Amino acid sequence: MAIYTRTGDAGTTSLFTGQRVSKTHPRVEAYGTLDELNAALSLCACAAADENHRTLLEAIQQQLFWFSAELASDSEQPSPKQRYISSEEISALEAAIDRAMARVEPLHSFILPGRCEAASRLHFARTLARRAERRLVELATEVNVRQVLMRYINRLSDCLYALARAEDSDAHQANIIREVSKRYLAACQPPHSKETTPVALSFHDLHQLTRAAVERAQQLQVPVVVSIVDAHGTETVTWRMPDALLVSSELAPKKAWTAVAMKTATHELSDVVQPGAALYGLESHLQGKVVTFGGGYALWRDGILIGGLGISGGSVEQDMDIAQTAIAAINVGTHQ
């Protein structure tokens, strides 16, 4: 079956109602841009990780067919055989916007359009929706355009922005979980060649670490909380000196756990959680369990992670000083 008619070779096209107009007519520009947008939404639906987003995008694509058909008709009389955009579709877009934006953190500056493939495609589709809106405004200066169509296309670009933010947030959270899991699993699986080496923190190690930390804290006249976890992040010792801040009882174990989970000192995480860095959002995604300022150290022996030490109560520099002094008292290192 031939798909060509040759009737458009002279630069004109036929509307649904039979009139022939130039292919540069504002009406053709408007529904032609909607066609571009519809094609872009197919790419978005293929890339979206969220099943609800895919379902919504496919529904929007069907609605754009109705939208285009209405623009491609010169008649203002509704056809009983045709579907039309209504307030119901606008309400569905607004509900989708609210759901998506409830899942993401507020922004206080401009962002690059998309850090994952799905978000990038959605942002691109958003720009096409904006262009379609401009074409529709231009068309409305020449012919009657239902106000509900103007509202729909305006809301659609907002919806695509919200979906892009949600896809970005989900992808970033998944990356963080993968990275943390990778580091944690690596810490829990020592090389086979080291299996017979006594690598766990002994009672003597725990005693020496705690004693050395307390003695250094007393020298600095800083009451602190000392917390030690094993290689699995399980708390083994926590000692609170008299007059130590109550919040330190929360922070010291978190510092020790973070050091084991991330296999690094907590102060070394500061740069990688900044906006735009690989682990940006790590603290919020793990509900505050991760600490990214000084005072937590991973404890290594013979290249194997054996535990973590967390100190809290003084300034960041004092906490790090106390931890380093305690670590020096036993046969462990702070890096693999």
From Swiss-Prot:
Reported consequences of knocking out the gene: Decreased growth on 1,2-PD cyanocobalamin medium; no growth is seen in a double cobA-pduO deletion.
Name the record gives this protein: Corrinoid adenosyltransferase PduO
Pfam families membership: Cob_adeno_trans, HbpS-like
GO terms under cellular component: propanediol degradation polyhedral organelle
Misc note: Bacterial microcompartments (BMC) 100-200 nm in cross section are formed during aerobic growth on minimal 1,2-PD-B12 or anaerobic growth on 1,2-PD-tetrathionate medium, but not during aerobic growth on glucose, anerobic growth on glucose or pyruvate-tetrathionate. BMCs can constitute up to 10% of total cell protein.
Subunit structure: The C-terminal domain (PduOC) forms stable octamers and also crystallizes as an octamer. Forms a complex with PduS.
UniProt induction comment: BMC production is induced by growth on 1,2-PD vitamin B12 medium.
Domain comment (free text): The N-terminus (PduON, residues 1-185) has adenosyltransferase activity in vivo and in vitro; it partially complements a deletion mutant for growth on 1,2-PD. The C-terminal domain (PduOC, residues 194-336) is required for full complemention of a pduO deletion.
Keyword terms of this UniProt record: ATP-binding, Bacterial microcompartment, Cobalamin biosynthesis, Heme, Iron, Magnesium, Metal-binding, Nucleotide-binding, Transferase
Organism: Salmonella typhimurium (strain LT2 / SGSC1412 / ATCC 700720)
Cofactor note: Stoichiometry of heme binding is 2 PduOC:1 heme; the binding pocket is formed by a PduOC dimer. Full-length PduO also binds heme. Mn(2+) and Co(2+) are almost as active as Mg(2+) for adenosylcobalamin synthesis.
Known catalytic reactions: cob(I)alamin-[corrinoid adenosyltransferase] + ATP = apo-[corrinoid adenosyltransferase] + adenosylcob(III)alamin + triphosphate
Annotated binding of Mg(2+), by residue: 215, 218
Residues covered by region (PduOC): 194-336
Family: Belongs to the Cob(I)alamin adenosyltransferase family. PduO subfamily.
